[in-house]
Structures are given as C-alpha cells and as structure tokens.
C-alpha cells in the first residue's frame, strides 16, 4: 500500500478543497486516463483496490500509472474516548483530489479493454469520474464539464 516513508510533520490540519486541479490535470504517460469530477479524499486502500482491479483485468499486457499519492495523514481517536486530551494518532493516509485531476493512466491495451479496466477502477473510488483519451485532454480543457 502507498504510504510516505518519512514526513516532516506527523499530523496535519484537515484543510478544505477549493476549485479545480491546476496540476496533474493532463495525461502525461499513457493513452487513457481516469479524471475526477468532484473533490474528495481518496485513501491508500481505495487506490490499491482500484490498481488491483485494473491490473487483474488487463492481465499481462499494458501498463498502469498511479498519478496520485496519499501524503495527508488522517488522525482518529479511539472509540469511547472522552473529548479533549489532544489530537488522535494517525490512522490512515489520503490523497487530496480536486475536480479535473487525472488519477490513473493506462497504455498498451486496446480501447475496449482500457475503458473496461478504468470502469472497474471507477467503482472502487468514492468520486464520480470520467474516462478520457489523451487527444480529448489535449484538444480542450479537461476541467470543463
């Protein structure tokens, strides 16, 4: 599973997700991509589940790129703990995803197989997504809905 090896600060503020993705909104490696249409936190387990779903479907052919990395720690306090006494310990890691962000890329397989693999990955993620081809993103703005 994806987790940072070292972090400068063990705990982070929650933060807010404003606007669209300005970085990571183009297909750089593959031919097909999975683009987020709404903001969300995507956990390292969800990323791994989507990756496994794609790689199992495309079998030995093709290549998958994961374009998001869970670098934000989410803390939680134990169950039945009284309020106060500080912030909880880090429980899991999330990737902050804004609309327009390309999360996964795929290449080296026919179009039908690529679309089905990305569709399977889409069902593992907590956001609405769309499947795009490299030409579609280069032609116009990917953030336009």
Swiss-Prot record:
Residues 1-21 have a biased composition (Basic residues). Pfam families: Ribosomal_L16. CDD domains: Ribosomal_L16_L10e. One of its GO terms (biological process) is translation. SUPFAM superfamilies: Ribosomal protein L16p/L10e. This is Large ribosomal subunit protein uL16. Transmembrane segments: none annotated. Signal peptide: none annotated. The keyword Ribonucleoprotein applies.
